[in-house]
Amino acid sequence: MATTTTPRLKTKYREEIAGKLQEEFSYENVMQTPGLVKIVVNMGVGDAARDSKLIDGAIRDLTTITGQKPAVTKARKSIAQFKLREGQPIGAHVTLRGDRMWEFLDRTLSLALPRIRDFRGLSPKQFDGRGNYTFGLTEQVMFHEIDQDKIDRVRGMDITVVTTATNDAEGRALLRHLGFPFKEA
């Protein structure tokens, strides 16, 4: 299902952002410019330990949002306090690369984030020290692909943006140029 046109954000990155970043950090080589590698969307369904049907709703939601079938995350070991057995499905995740990644990022930044109630921006402190950024969304209905009448329950998700940046300053600059609405510290 490859699109014939280049995604809007990818074009903007290639034509404008890459040049700005190269000037800003004065790179000697074009390949040193930070870029996006992949986006991982993770949906943990802890209640699936008690009711295995709940994982189907998470898979359906993730497929609708990302356009890609998610991989089911299984428990690595048994934990009696959580009534969890090894190998039991406890979540689902999708790894997006290429054009699908750019399209998803564009939809998230321009459509989903503005639909969050009382949204004041993303925290600028959630970088991992290597230029990758992770943020959480509390409900899946902020994506317009999800029909609000058909959801069985509200589920949150974690979205990790993996970049080629070597430190947080480069990663923050890349994501700010791409249009991430960071809160001012």
UniProtKB/Swiss-Prot annotation:
Q: One cellular component GO annotation, for this chain's record? A: ribonucleoprotein complex
Q: Which Pfam families match?
A: Ribosomal_L5 (PF00281), Ribosomal_L5_C (PF00673)
- Similarity annotation: Belongs to the universal ribosomal protein uL5 family.
Q: How does it assemble?
A: Part of the 50S ribosomal subunit; part of the 5S rRNA/L5/L18/L25 subcomplex. Contacts the 5S rRNA and the P site tRNA. Forms a bridge to the 30S subunit in the 70S ribosome.
| Taxonomy of the source species | Bacteria, Bacillati, Actinomycetota, Actinomycetes, Kitasatosporales
Q: Which UniProt keywords apply?
A: Ribonucleoprotein, Ribosomal protein, RNA-binding, rRNA-binding, tRNA-binding
Q: One of this protein's GO BP terms?
A: translation
Asked if Transferase is a keyword of the record, the answer is no
Where does the source fall among the domains of life? Bacteria
Where are the coiled-coil regions? Answer: none
Which species is this UniProt entry from? Streptomyces avermitilis (strain ATCC 31267 / DSM 46492 / JCM 5070 / NBRC 14893 / NCIMB 12804 / NRRL 8165 / MA-4680)
Key word Transmembrane present? no
Molecular function as annotated in GO: rRNA binding; structural constituent of ribosome; tRNA binding
Q: What is this protein called?
A: Large ribosomal subunit protein uL5
Q: What's the stated role of this polypeptide? A: This is one of the proteins that bind and probably mediate the attachment of the 5S RNA into the large ribosomal subunit, where it forms part of the central protuberance. In the 70S ribosome it contacts protein S13 of the 30S subunit (bridge B1b), connecting the 2 subunits; this bridge is implicated in subunit movement. Contacts the P site tRNA; the 5S rRNA and some of its associated proteins might help stabilize positioning of ribosome-bound tRNAs.
